[in-house]
Amino acid sequence: MGGHSSSDVASPRIVEGAEDARSASADRDDDSVLLRVENLRKEYRSGLQPLVLFDGLNLTVRQGEMIAIVGESGAGKSTLLHLLAALDRPSAGDVYFASTWLGKLTAGEAATFRNREIGYVWQLHYLLPEFTALENVAMPLLAREEPKPSAFVKARELLREVGLEARVNHLAGELSGGEQQRVSLARALVTQPRLLLADEPTGNLDNRTAEAVFGLLERLHTTHRLTSILVTHNMAMAKRCGRTLRLHEGRLHEVWLHSSESEEASAEGRIASSDAPGHPIVRTAVPGANRTGTA
């Protein structure tokens, strides 16, 4: 695309169809691309008319990126993560993880793929209450028949990384909400995945605890050399990611935010007001700079 005037660069913008502007053929030959989504469509049958969540959605994620996905409730953000993790199948279109086409995987192959390549953190921790923190974290390793001593060593190390070394033998129900989410994060990383998917990982936490958990997530993203995609309604956290993508009307739109607080507030207002029908989304070629930090 062409150059932009200083007025174009001076204010935050929302990039319409940012992923459509990428060259699909170039991405296929780019070794830095970890995840590629092409012309994704997802619909559900509801009566006579289908409910279409996505149609022609495209996404390219490169290794090491930390991406936030924002959008109004019901836009399909959680469904998109399910498709990226092969927990669900698209109605049309393709999802590629490195050189693997997820559409060819059987249910068993998809389960193995998730166990080895994907770490998943939900808003609800889904820990097994009758097991200790150590046992919960070791579960993905035990599921693939790794010997218990080895699995427990790795689980203990992850719990140390998330600051819960003193709580390894506590039952899940004996932990606070923040501690439970830390255990969930340790469980997601114990298999050394390349991709971390987090669906509202701080949504059930108070502000102080949410900030601590998100800071931990940032640090682990760096130390474990992860590629991370987070769904969040928290714009302050989204701004700390390398890219922010807004899911709106079945497409992803890149949101570019300046570091200036006044301009970021203006951008948040644009995003909020753009939920109204007919709101124009401005196209610009300026990408977001990498703002991923460590805590």
Give the location of each predicted region.
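Exposed, low-complexity/repetitive linear segments and helix-based recognition motifs
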Residues: 5, 13-17, 24-28, 52, ...
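ABC family nucleotide-binding domain
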Residues: 33-247
